[in-house]
Each structure stands twice: as structure tokens, then as C-alpha cells.
């Protein structure tokens, strides 16, 4: 009987931890993460204070924080080739990172770190030098900055069969030296690294290449982590939020379902399908059942996004900033529809897969600069600063915890729906105008369309819609309009 009770206690404790690891630890009604890809820590701190907090963002995913190899030309992917766990990168040093985390937490913005637990750097010709000056010999699996030696890695082999579990989880992903997470020593170094970040005040982690690690090893590592630091405003016994990169198209041996109880999982099918729909390859009317009915994960397990730093560089259905009208429509739908844990992308301009972030002649990352409207101008795209996107972050806050209702469509690519009595969204992806009296579900009054303008000092700088006592309003979205979407909510009532 004692053994059964002990087993039950351990099982319940494990379930409790895994549920806690799905909690992003947001402040108030905030509920959108932005990925400030390759930004410097000092710039993120200022962005938290001056832009993200005032506009209701909930958190920031930051690029990898630990020392990485220096690659010729400084491509973005060098950040994903670690050689030690020292907190020095082109984004800044440990002091600057800690200052950023503190300042962002102070204004209610949580920090989630992209962490590399699967591997160290790939082969390098001779001795490699990292961003903190550490030397390593990746070809010999020698990383004295940790330290790791060859015995801490799986034997070298190549992934040639993605349906072979051994290859996927113990061979080298694109030549990156594959750590043995089943080793007590390797586990201890990874836990030490993550716990240090927790001590500095981070709220959680995006786990890169999670499918290339056995779920039972990750379960042990996650379960061994410290609780979040209460000195940064987290409640007692709060667990780090975990979201794991698992690319699962539904036909491979290693499945997302092995990981979704450990934490949230990046729902790549969401990204692919929303791209198909707003590129016109699937009618928007079918989006009424968007979510788990499409074969996606359950809402509380899914980290959702239109694009990410990887797939925005690939060809195919995924939308990115280079198709701005469709991208803004897709993002508006993403943030308005009640499904998933939402993350928006903030990119830099790229011409090819390897384009580095904006940098000076000495290869130092440069700070974003802004025009009079607050848009970025010097190689940074900053989608999160587009009015049509940050306004939808405010919309999502206004409609939090409300249900989808009042769905309407024209049988094709014009749709609208309500979020309770708090918000209304309409989209026109047809080649003709949407002009229709529609149920907005909102209380009677005049509302500012937060896509075409902003509510400033009681006046709307864009379109406005008058809602009658029955909740109906006249909605017009011309086929030639730049945005193709209209959004109203109770916090934008004139």
C-alpha cells in the first residue's frame, strides 16, 4: 500500500509540474509574446519600457544568450552553435542581460530565452574562438569552457532517415555535436545553465531542437529546475514556462505528442495552414473550425505563430513580412481567434538564408532606428511596431477569456466574428469589396477601427463604425485597401 501511495504521489507531482510548465506567467490581461530576433539586450530593455509595456505585450523571446562560435560573415545561425554557457554574445554580456531582464520584469514584460540543450557547435577547421574569447575544438568534441569532452556526446553519425528514432535523437543534426542528455554530468551542466538564467529572472525557455532529445531526458531536466525567482515578481512555487521546438508534420516517428505534456509545443502546422489560407490557397470560410479540429494541438499546449526565424526564410506557404497585406491579415486573425499561446515575429531584412542581423563595419549588431511614426528604418523590420500588429495585441488583451461567437462568411474569403461582447474582426481576402451590415456583438456606440487608425484623445485617426442597439454595424473593406481587415473592441470606443 505504501509503495502504491508513493507511486501515486510521484505521478501527481509530475503531472502538477508539467501543467505548471504550460503557464507563461503573464501579468494581468496581457497575452502575446514577441520574438525580438537578434536584438541587443540594452535595446530590448528600452523597448520593454518605452514600447512593449505601454502597448500591452506580455513577453519577449530573446535569441540564445550563451557564448557561440564566430562564423565568417556572422550569419544569424552562429547563435545556434554554442561553445560554452558563458553569457556573452553579440547581444551583450551577462551584466547587460541581467539588467534587461530586471527592467523588463519591472514593467510587466516576461523574458523567455531560446536555449540550446541538444548540441554544441559543429565542425570547425582547427581551434574555434567564441564570442567570450573561449577556445574549443569542435571536431574533437572538446569544449573546455563548459567543460565537455568526447565522452559527453553521442558517437558521431548522420541523420539520413527521419523515421529512425535513433538517428533523429542520437545522430548529429546538420553536423552539430550531439550531447548525451542521459548522462548525469551533461544533465547537471544543462540544469546549472538554466538555473542561472532563472536566478537572473527569466520566466521560461524556448527549447531548440527538442524532438532531437528523448522526452524522458527532457522531463528529468525540466523537473530538476528551480522555481522562478520571487524577487522578480513571480509568485511562490511558480515553474518556468517551457515551449519546445518540435517540427511534426504528422508522418514522422518522433511525435509532438511525446512532448506536449512536458510543456507547450511549437505548432508548425498552424503556421503552414494560416499561410495557405491567406495566400488564397484555402477559403477563409473554413477557418471557423480553426484549432484542434484541424489536427492542431489543444489550445493550451500550442505555441502559435504566423512565421518564425527559421521558416520565414524557407520557400512555400509560410507568410513573412515580404507579403505585408496578407501577413497583416493573417496576424490579425491569429491574434483575434481564441486558439493557442500567441507569438509574433520581429525580424530583420534578409535577402538569403544566411543574412546576418544589421551590423556595422566591425560586425557589431547595431541598434534599431525609428522614423517619425515609430517604424524601424535601418535594416530592422520590426513587425511588432506596425500599427496593424500592435493594435491587435491590444485587441487580444481586450477580449481575453471571451468566446468566439457570431461567425459570418460569404461562402468564400470574406469572414467576420465576435469575441464575446468585447471585440469584432472582419477580413476581406476577395478581389471585390466587403460591404455588409454585420453583427459586431458590441454595445451600441461608435468604435475606432484599430487597423486603419488609432484612438487618440477621443478621436479616431482611421475608419470608425457606428453600432446600433442590436449590435449591428455597417462594415466596409474595399478590395484595394492596403490592410484587408477591420478590428473593433471595447477599449477603442469613442
Swiss-Prot record:
Active site: 208, 245
GO CC, one annotated term: extracellular region
Bridged cysteine pairs (disulfide): 48-104, 157-171, 376-382, 418-441, 448-460
One Gene Ontology term from the biological process aspect of the record: carbohydrate metabolic process
Signal peptide, first to last residue: 1-20
Keywords: Calcium, Carbohydrate metabolism, Chloride, Disulfide bond, Glycosidase, Hydrolase, Metal-binding, Pyrrolidone carboxylic acid, Secreted, Signal
SMART domains: Aamy, Aamy_C
Major localisation: secreted
Record note on cofactor: Binds 1 Ca(2+) ion per subunit. Binds 1 Cl(-) ion per subunit.
Domain of life: Eukaryota
Positions that bind chloride: 206, 308, 343
Catalytic activity, as annotated: Endohydrolysis of (1->4)-alpha-D-glucosidic linkages in polysaccharides containing three or more (1->4)-alpha-linked D-glucose units
GO molecular function ontology, one term from the record: metal ion binding
UniProt cofactor(s): Ca(2+); chloride
Calcium in keyword set: yes
Enzyme class name: hydrolase
PANTHER family (UniProt xref): ALPHA-AMYLASE (PTHR43447)
Subunit structure: Monomer.
UniProt record similarity statement: Belongs to the glycosyl hydrolase 13 family.
Stated name of the protein: Alpha-amylase-related protein
Gene designation: Amyrel
Amino acid at each position: 500500500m505504501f509503495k502504491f501511495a508513493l507511486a501515486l504521489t510521484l505521478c501527481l507531482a509530475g503531472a502538477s509540474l508539467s501543467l505548471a510548465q504550460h503557464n507563461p506567467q503573464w501579468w494581468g490581461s496581457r497575452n502575446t509574446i514577441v520574438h525580438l530576433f537578434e536584438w541587443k539586450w540594452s535595446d530590448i530593455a528600452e523597448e520593454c519600457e518605452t514600447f512593449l509595456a505601454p502597448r500591452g505585450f506580455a513577453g519577449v523571446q530573446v535569441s540564445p544568450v550563451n557564448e557561440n562560435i564566430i562564423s565568417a560573415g556572422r550569419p544569424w545561425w552562429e547563435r545556434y552553435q554554442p561553445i560554452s554557457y558563458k553569457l556573452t554574445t553579440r547581444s551583450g554580456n551577462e551584466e547587460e542581460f541581467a539588467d534587461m531582464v530586471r527592467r523588463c520584469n519591472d514593467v510587466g514584460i516576461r523574458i523567455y530565452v531560446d536555449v540550446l540543450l541538444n548540441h554544441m557547435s559543429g565542425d570547425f577547421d582547427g581551434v574555434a574562438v567564441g564570442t567570450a574569447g573561449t577556445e574549443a575544438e569542435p571536431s574533437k568534441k572538446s569544449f573546455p569552457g563548459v567543460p565537455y569532452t568526447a565522452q559527453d556526446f553521442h558517437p558521431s553519425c548522420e541523420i539520413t532517415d527521419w523515421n529512425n528514432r535513433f538517428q533523429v535523437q542520437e545522430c548529429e543534426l546538420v553536423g552539430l555535436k550531439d550531447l548525451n542528455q542521459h548522462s548525469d554530468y551533461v544533465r547537471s551542466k544543462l540544469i546549472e545553465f538554466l538555473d542561472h538564467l532563472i536566478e537572473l529572472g527569466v520566466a521560461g525557455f524556448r527549447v531548440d531542437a527538442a524532438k532531437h532529445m528523448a522526452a524522458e531526458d527532457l522531463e528529468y531536466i525540466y523537473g530538476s529546475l528551480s522555481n522562478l525567482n520571487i524577487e522578480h515578481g513571480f509568485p511562490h512555487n511558480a515553474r518556468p514556462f517551457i515551449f519546445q521546438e518540435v517540427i511534426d508534420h504528422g508522418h514522422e516517428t518522433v511525435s509532438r505528442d511525446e512532448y506536449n505534456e512536458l510543456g507547450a509545443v511549437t505548432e508548425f502546422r498552424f503556421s503552414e495552414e494560416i499561410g495557405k489560407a491567406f495566400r488564397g490557397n484555402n477559403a477563409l470560410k473554413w477557418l471557423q473550425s480553426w484549432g484542434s479540429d484541424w489536427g492542431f494541438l489543444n489550445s493550451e499546449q500550442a505555441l502559435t505563430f504566423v512565421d518564425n526565424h527559421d521558416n520565414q526564410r524557407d520557400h512555400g506557404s509560410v507568410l513573412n513580412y515580404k507579403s505585408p497585406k496578407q501577413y497583416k491579415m493573417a496576424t490579425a486573425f491569429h491574434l483575434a481567434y481564441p486558439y493557442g499561446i500567441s507569438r509574433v515575429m520581429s525580424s530583420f531584412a534578409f535577402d538569403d538564408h544566411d543574412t546576418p542581423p544589421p551590423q556595422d563595419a566591425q560586425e557589431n549588431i547595431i541598434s534599431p532606428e525609428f522614423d517619425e511614426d515609430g517604424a524601424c528604418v535601418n535594416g530592422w523590420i520590426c513587425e511588432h511596431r506596425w500599427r496593424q500588429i500592435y493594435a491587435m495585441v491590444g485587441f487580444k488583451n481586450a477580449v481575453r477569456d471571451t468566446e468566439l461567437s457570431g461567425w459570418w462568411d460569404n461562402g468564400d474569403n470574406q469572414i467576420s466574428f465576435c469575441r464575446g461582447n468585447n471585440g469584432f474582426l472582419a477580413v476581406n481576402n476577395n478581389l471585390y469589396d466587403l460591404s455588409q451590415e454585420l453583427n459586431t456583438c458590441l454595445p451600441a456606440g461608435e468604435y475606432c477601427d484599430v487597423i486603419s487608425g488609432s484612438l487618440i484623445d477621443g478621436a479616431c485617426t482611421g475608419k470608425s463604425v457606428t453600432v446600433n442597439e442590436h449590435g449591428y454595424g455597417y462594415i466596409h473593406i474595399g478590395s484595394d485597401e492596403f490592410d484587408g481587415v477591420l478590428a473593433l473592441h471595447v477599449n477603442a470606443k469613442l
